[in-house]
């Protein structure tokens, strides 16, 4: 098999040197972009150097260590796309408002807020595009404020410098032993299967609620992390296409096993049932490895094949999902062709995407960015401060990058501390070290490389202020061609950065995000819709796989309400009911199909209702329709395994009516 460069790292492969691999990678990328920027006679090599630092340092700070190869490349591609969108936005604003500078700045603030609003609605791995587009437009307009006719030239130069910086980062990543995620994926798949089997053992043995909650919570997080690894794997190379398809299905199989194990536990708690000795004999022995789980699942399959009458239906479903999981894991490990059996598994379900539940949260994020940049613009215009532009730029950068992260306040503090650290560090570099290196590009690269290396080590440790210090210090050094050493300009820029970050942090703290309860209620009502939407006689709709979307919403619920176990249990019950109702054998009937459509429409109205009274009225209507639906099923003399789950869903919704409708 032909090996790629990813499989043959060139440097820093030993464990002792691997700890400093990222710092050397970051340093090499920064120094190479600086050297090429001067060699190619770029106007502002500083942009290429900052791009290299941001693209390499950002993922490392988030990961708390060396980022995977795919993460760096993905970040680079997003930065290119976001820059192009920002340049187009800047050209459009300048062309339309060239005779009205104040209107131009106002449109800039609105554009930044709009981009941040969009970035809060899209998938989090792609949100960087729109956040970057917002402040790129602001940077271009501020840089060409006195000479708007040069905007196209400046936009082209900025795009060229950013592409150069990204190319240097990717080359450094390939050169310094890229960290492939494939081995981590294989290990996570094995560990996840062991965790799934242990959850099943706890469910069958009647463990206490605290242990069950802790275990399934950890498995949900590991399954979500596995889906993130799948995205990183695809960023590495296109040769992982087959593994990507398998991992998508493995995500569903893992969620199915979690759901079936939890349903088994809840069913046994409600109706205690004696577990056969033959079943206990297979389930009770502890498992320590992936091989042990494979052996136990095989024994369970033989037991079910011999006599499935005394085996809980949820356990049968769990074993089926585990069998599919084991089959697909083997394919991921080899990355071979997809067999016919695997293709049947992969094509069985059609995954459904759902819109974001954080629309109000996104609106607050956009408002924060728009207000913050408008305040910076007002401060600049009223004072006439020469570095008001860089203050505005830092406000836009901080508010755009911080809002989508789980803790915007900490991101704002990191930038504020970083800009404060950059003042003495930048002064040392700008006043004493860099002037002594003007006769030699080698000395210039060595001095900047030494600073980058030590800051890179701190970034890898997630030291507060380290990433902000790296970016802010490079920004105030003014690495232009030719270089000039204007002390007053340096101080203005350094202080402007600090004030901009302070204003951004104040806006984050003062404009509070009070949408938490609204988001939680929307998520819970979407769980209800997911459960009732499983009631259908349409075979095509039955193949719709809502499970990944439901667990994605559950994961968001976990992040927004980390200590509210009641919400978790309600959401988990709705997911369980979705899975149970999806398997009901409902006969083809025009009247039932019409009732299904009516129930779905009412559940959708519960989600869309803006007022509590309207929501409560629609929720009461939904309960009445479900009760009437159960009566129709009973009148048609359908078996209890069809009517009882519908009654169970109605009972759960009635118990939680206050939490769901008010």
Curated annotation (Swiss-Prot):
It holds the Pfam family FUSC. Forms an efflux pump with AaeA. Could function as a metabolic relief valve, allowing to eliminate certain compounds when they accumulate to high levels in the cell. The keyword Endoplasmic reticulum does not apply. Belongs to the aromatic acid exporter ArAE (TC 2.A.85) family. The keyword Transcription does not apply. GO terms for biological process: carboxylic acid transport. GO terms for cellular component: plasma membrane. This is p-hydroxybenzoic acid efflux pump subunit AaeB. One of its GO terms (molecular function) is transmembrane transporter activity. It is found in: Cell inner membrane. Keywords: Cell inner membrane, Cell membrane, Membrane, Transmembrane, Transmembrane helix, Transport. It comes from the Bacteria. The chain crosses the membrane at residues 22-42, 52-72, 78-98, 102-122, 129-149, 161-181, 378-398, 415-435, 439-459, 467-487, 491-511. HAMAP family: AaeB. InterPro entries: PHBA_efflux_AaeB/fusaric-R, PHBA_efflux_pump_AaeB. It comes from Pectobacterium parmentieri (strain WPP163) (Pectobacterium wasabiae (strain WPP163)). It is a multi-pass membrane protein.
């Amino acid at each position: 098999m032909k090996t790629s460069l990813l499989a043959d790292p060139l440097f820093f492969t030993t464990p002792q040197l691997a700890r400093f691999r990222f710092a050397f990678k970051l340093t090499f990328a920064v120094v190479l972009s600086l050297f090429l920027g001067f060699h190619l006679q770029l106007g502002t090599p500083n942009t290429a150097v900052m791009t290299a630092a941001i693209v390499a340092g950002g993922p490392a700070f988030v990961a708390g260590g060396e980022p995977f190869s795919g993460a760096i490349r993905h970040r680079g591609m997003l930065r290119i796309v976001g820059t192009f969108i920002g340049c187009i936005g800047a050209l459009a604003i300048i062309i339309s408002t060239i005779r009205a500078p104040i209107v131009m700045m106002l449109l800039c603030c609105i554009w930044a807020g709009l981009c941040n609003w969009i970035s809060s609605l899209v998938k989090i791995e792609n949100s960087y595009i729109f956040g970057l587009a917002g402040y790129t437009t602001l940077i271009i307009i501020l840089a060409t404020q006195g000479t708007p006719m040069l905007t196209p030239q400046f936009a082209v130069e900025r795009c060229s410098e950013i592409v150069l910086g990204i190319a240097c980062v990717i080359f450094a990543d390939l050169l310094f032993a890229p960290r492939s995620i494939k081995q981590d994926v294989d290990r996570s798949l094995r560990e996840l299967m062991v965790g799934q089997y242990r959850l099943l053992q706890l469910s069958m043995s009647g463990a206490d609620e605290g242990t069950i909650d802790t275990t399934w919570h950890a498995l949900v997080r590991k399954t979500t992390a596995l889906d993130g690894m799948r995205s990183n794997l695809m960023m590495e190379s296109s040769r992982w296409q087959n593994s990507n398809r398998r991992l998508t299905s493995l995500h569903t199989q893992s969620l199915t096993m979690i759901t079936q194990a939890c349903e088994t536990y809840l069913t046994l708690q409600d109706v205690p049932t004696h577990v056969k000795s033959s079943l206990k004999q297979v389930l009770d022995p502890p498992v320590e490895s992936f091989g042990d789980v494979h052996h136990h699942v095989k024994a369970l399959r033989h037991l079910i094949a011999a006599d499935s009458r005394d085996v809980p239906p949820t356990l049968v479903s769990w074993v089926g999902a585990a069998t599919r999981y084991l089959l697909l894991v083997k394919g991921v490990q080899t990355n071979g062709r997809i067999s016919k059996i695997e293709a049947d598994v992969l094509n069985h379900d059609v995954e459904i995407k759902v819109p974001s539940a954080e629309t109000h949260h996104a609106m607050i994020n956009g408002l924060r960015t728009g207000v913050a940049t408008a305040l910076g613009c007002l401060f600049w215009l009223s004072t006439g401060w020469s570095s008001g532009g860089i203050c505005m730029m830092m406000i836009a950068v901080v508010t755009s990058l911080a809002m989508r992260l789980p803790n915007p306040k900490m991101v704002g503090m990191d930038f504020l501390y970083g800009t404060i650290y950059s003042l003495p560090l930048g002064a040392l570099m700008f006043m004493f070290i860099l002037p002594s290196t003007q006769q030699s590009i080698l000395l210039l690269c060595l001095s900047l490389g030494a600073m980058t290396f030590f800051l890179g080590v701190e970034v890898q440790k997630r030291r507060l202020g380290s990433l902000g210090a790296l970016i802010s210090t490079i920004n105030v050094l003014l690495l232009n061609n030719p270089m000039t050493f204007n002390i007053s300009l340096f101080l203005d820029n350094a202080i402007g950065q600090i004030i901009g970050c302070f204003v951004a942090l104040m806006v984050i703290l003062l404009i509070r995000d009070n949408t938490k309860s609204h988001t939680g209620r929307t998520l819970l009502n979407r769980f209800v819709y997911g459960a009732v939407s499983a009631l259908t006689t349409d075979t095509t709709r039955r193949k719709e796989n809502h499970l990944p979307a439901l667990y994605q919403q559950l994961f968001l619920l976990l992040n927004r309400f980390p200590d509210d176990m009641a919400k978790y249990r309600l959401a988990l019950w709705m997911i369980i009911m979705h899975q149970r109702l999806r398997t009901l054998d409902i006969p083809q009937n025009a009247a039932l199909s019409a009732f299904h459509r009516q129930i779905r429409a009412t559940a959708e109205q519960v989600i869309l209702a803006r007022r509590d009274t309207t929501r409560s009225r629609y929720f009461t209507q939904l309960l009445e329709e479900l009760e009437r639906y159960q009566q129709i099923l009973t009148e048609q003399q359908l078996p209890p395994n069809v009517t009882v789950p519908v009654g169970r869903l109605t009972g759960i919704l009635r118990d939680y009516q206050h939490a769901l409708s008010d």
